[in-house]
Every structure is written in C-alpha cells, then in structure tokens.
C-alpha cells in the first residue's frame, strides 16, 4: 500500500526573540494532531526547529488536501496559545509552508531537513559531500556499485545533471586493495 507524507512548518509562537518555539505551543499542536490520528493520519511527529513548529504526518495518497486542513487547524490552535501568552512570531496561518511526498510505502525511510531562517540551499554542500566525496564517505570506494558514482540533478541550474567522477572512486579502491601502489 502506498501512502504520502506531508511536512508543515510554521512560526506560530516563540521566545526569546523567536529563538525557540514555546513548549506550550508545541504541546497544543501535538495534542491536536494526536486527537486526529487514525482518520486520516496514519502517524505523526511534532517537533520544533528554532522558533518554528514542525509537523511530519503520514497519510493515504489521496488525503493530502484534508491533511493540510487538519495540520493548518492544529497550527492555528498553537498560534492561539502563542497569542494568549504574548509570544514573538505568532504569524498568521497562511505563513505555514507545506510539502507533500507521494508514493511512500510502509517501510519507506523519510529524512526531513529543517532549518530556522535559512534557505533550502543550506543543505546542498553537505549532501553533495556525503554522496560524492570519497574522503567523507569511504564506502563509496569500497562498493563496486557505488563506485560508478552518482548523477546529481539540480533544478533551476543551467546544467541540471552532474555526474560525479567514478574514476576517482576506482583509483581510491585500487589504492586501498593494494593493486595500485
């Protein structure tokens, strides 16, 4: 059975100076989400990143409009707690950002990268090093399949496809196993 995962992030009540989401705000959002688990949510996780509240929710593939409303309502409830406490950053509901990933299975691993006050490009150099630099990830040179390298696809770039050098990985493998002394 395939499903979907929706991630929602919103700054709805933080202290001091929007540095950390208030625990009561996070608790209220979490409570509202837990009340609705099972219909239509299969599971969820609520956390904070800096002054923002983050919700990761698993659900059926066709449920995402309904799920977005549910998550928006939970964020609105958290925002109300923030307003009542006079917290910073009680943005409006429309400031929440949502992303839905379709086609996830029961055992699909999900990795969510969240930053506070940084664009999505903040992760690009780190992920590139992780998957392309054999000095960062030695297994790249050890495994014959991984040694072929990776193709990176960057949207919005004039050259959208980049092939990582498989040759350097073969050289390192030869140096490691003693055939290239």
Positions of PLM-derived features:
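Regulatory and interdomain segments flanking nucleotide-handling catalytic cores
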Residues: 1-181
